[in-house]
Amino acid sequence: MLIYIYMKIKQTNYLYLSIFIFIIICVCIYGYNSGSCKINKKYICNDDFCLYKEFDVYLKNEIKKEITYLSANKKIQKRVNILTFPETIFNCALPNKKGITISTNNIVKYAPNLIHFYQNDLCKLVSRQLKLNLFPTNLELPTTCALLIYENEGDWINWHYDYNYYDGRFFTLLIPITNYLTCTEFQFKNDKNEIKSINLINNNSICFEGNFLYHRASKLCKNEKRIILSCQYVTNNHMSFLNRVRLKIKDYAYIGKLGA
């Protein structure tokens, strides 16, 4: 009888171990294909742009006033807390995100000057800096032009690539709204797997090709606040049906809203 019980326990332990290993394998496969794992990628690099570029972006007073209103309006702010443990497995970072997002639809509703700037003068500025003909992305997508707010201790987003759902190249521009140093920095890993940090202060903005740049926002310290304006641009707005579905799922997970 004791031998029988021992064998049943042993079989159960093997079953749990097999399930655990299967889950780990699935997570690694998902991470590899979704942008969670650091991998070697071939990318376009020239004198005009190579993975990222820093340049100053200045906002007019009427735009700053709109952003001040947005950042004070708690009703339109969506906090997303995605917590997984451990934070990394081997060379893959598990989905971890803590912070507030004000999505595009609220920017359109409450900040018309900002949207006009995003679609016109800012688009032209980024196009000149990168020497590319860029286009704004669809305003019905929640991350097209969004405000990112980190205000609680530990707010951050883990290492990841920005999956490119478009037929053309895909770029993200980050503009600092709070122009002072915090623990939350824009960080990326270079080809040598070294962590590099960029301080987004004093109007210093960064435009990067997130599909090829492995990056994160490091964790915020206590009694700090960081506000970033995130703007997305592409060389071709067309998107396949499958990628459109995948983008909807991603937006729902990270923003809590579905795009068009």
Regions found by a protein language model. Give the residues of each.
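Structured loops at beta-to-helix junctions and adjacent beta-edge loops in soluble globular domains
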Residues: 54-55, 148-151, 176, 209-211, ...
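Conserved short histidine dyad/triad with adjacent acidic residue
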Residues: 148-164
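Signature of the catalytic double-stranded beta-helix
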Residues: 91-144
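Catalytic core of Fe(II)/2-oxoglutarate
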Residues: 180-260
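Short, conserved beta-strand element in jelly-roll/cupin
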Residues: 166-182
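Intrinsically disordered, low-complexity terminal segments enriched in Ser/Thr
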Residues: 3-5
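N-terminal auxiliary "cap/dimerization" subdomain that precedes the catalytic jelly-roll/cupin core
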Residues: 9-101, 116, 120, 255-260
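Short, charged/polar surface micro-motifs in flexible loops or helix N-caps
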Residues: 124, 150-155, 178-182, 213
